[in-house]
Design a protein with these regions (language model features):
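N-terminal membrane-targeting hydrophobic helices
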Residues: 1-145
Length: 145
């Protein structure tokens, strides 16, 4: 329930977290990206073992968090946003290079899968704080006197 555009007291969203219908649309968008990338990958005639073995590869960029949360979030978000893999897809398609096209579609599929599962882009304050997380129903913090 929303009151004046704000979340009701039983729904505590972290700042910057998408809630409500826009959040559901973003999750659907992630699923669509995943399905589309699977279809696109199938046209490359590359081994499905390649797709399975590289599907989680972008998560290696979470290692950036060892150098601090701000750097980690920046590096992770760079690997979990669509411009770089879309560029790979474009170059692969333009040059007729099926492996490059396949790598781009696998990368986009990973991003779509993450979005569908509510793993969003990270904020620098906390690894768990994303644009899609933190909207779940949470208990208000207890304040002890």
């Amino acid at each position: 329930m929303k009151v004046d555009g704000q979340a009701a007291s039983d729904e505590v969203a972290l700042p910057g977290t998408v809630v409500g219908a826009p959040r559901r649309w973003l999750l659907l968008e992630g699923m669509t990206l995943l399905v589309g990338s699977i279809v696109a990958f199938s046209t490359t005639h590359q081994s499905w073992w390649l797709a399975l073995s590289l599907l989680l590869a972008p998560d290696i960029f979470a290692a950036g968090y060892m150098l601090g949360t701000r750097f980690g979030a920046h590096l992770y978000n760079m690997a979990h946003a669509t411009p770089l893999p879309a560029l790979l897809v474009g170059v692969g398609w333009w040059q007729g290079h099926q492996l490059v096209l396949a790598l781009g579609t696998i990368w986009l599929g990973h991003i779509g899968m993450d979005r569908m599962l509510t793993f969003g882009l990270k904020y620098p304050d906390n690894f768990q704080h994303t644009h899609l997380s933190g909207a779940e129903k949470q208990q208000e913090p207890h304040h002890y006197a």
